[in-house]
Regions:
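Gly/Ala-rich beta-loop-alpha elbow adjacent to hydrolase catalytic centers
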Residues: 49-58
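Catalytic active-site module of serine/aspartate enzymes centered on a nucleophile-bearing elbow/loop
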Residues: 178-208
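Flexible "cap/lid" loop of the alpha/beta hydrolase fold
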Residues: 63-99, 127, 136-139, 194-198
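Active-site catalytic motif of lipid deacylating hydrolases and related acyltransferases
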Residues: 1-44, 79-80
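Short alpha-helix in the alpha/beta-hydrolase fold that links the catalytic acid
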Residues: 16, 154, 165-178
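Short beta-strand/loop motif that positions the catalytic acidic residue
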Residues: 158-160, 164
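Conserved alpha/beta-hydrolase catalytic His-Asp/Glu region
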Residues: 102-142
């Protein structure tokens, strides 16, 4: 199970059990996009899961590389992360970066989680990275997205949370034309959804 988490992620947020027989590699902190491909060589089957900004990062990392993908799932993100029609509207992204602060981060997390209960659950996982680290990561992503744009990497399925307040669902639908879409009643970050996906349960991992 190879999981590219979203911007601002860290290990504490995704300490979930995975399906028996699978190893678990979590990728986060995109201040650099360096990836050691030898870590996943030798596997006969790899499940790729990417969330939010991790969708663009994974697309960038694996374009031109072939691995034995069992399934490639994108969750609440698109290959066009800064885009008025297919991602986060450009002015919103730029405003977040230009005015980034502890207060900005707190507001973002509330919007990402969608409810006070979900926000409390998120914070109970004790995120430890500093606001300055997260600002640096967001700035690095902005530079990379501007420099490289989208890639030709093909995803098998896109999962769209109908209550997502970060990547508007309408924009996600626009971005994923030609890709199989599954809709779910979820916020941008939904603990139960990630628990299910990382455990390998549910129809999301089933080929139709």
């Amino acid at each position: 199970m190879l999981f590219f988490a979203g911007w601002g992620s860290e290990e504490n947020l995704f300490r979930h059990p995975v399906e028996e027989g699978y190893d678990y590699l979590l990728c986060f902190d995109y201040r650099t996009l360096d990836f050691d491909y030898t870590q996943i060589e030798g596997y006969t089957e790899i499940r790729l899961l990417a969330w939010s900004m991790g969708v663009w990062v994974a697309s960038r990392v694996f374009t031109g590389h072939s691995f034995p993908w069992q399934m490639k799932l994108a969750v609440n993100g698109t290959p066009f992360p800064i885009d008025d029609r297919r991602g986060i509207p450009e002015m919103i992204f730029k405003g977040t970066l230009e005015h980034f602060s502890e207060d900005t981060l707190a507001r973002f997390r509330r919007r990402m989680c969608g409810s006070s209960g979900q926000t409390e659950e998120f914070l109970s996982r004790t995120p430890t990275r500093t606001a300055e680290e997260l600002r640096e990561e967001l700035a690095a992503l902005a530079l990379g997205i501007t420099a490289y744009g989208s890639s030709s990497f093909i995803w098998d399925r896109a999962i769209i949370g109908n209550r997502d307040k970060i990547f508007p669902p309408r924009n996600q639908h626009e971005a994923w034309q030609g890709t199989e879409i599954m809709e779910t009643e979820a916020e941008h970050y939904e603990t139960s959804l990630f628990s299910r996906l990382l455990e390998g349960k549910g129809e999301e991992w089933t080929r139709h």
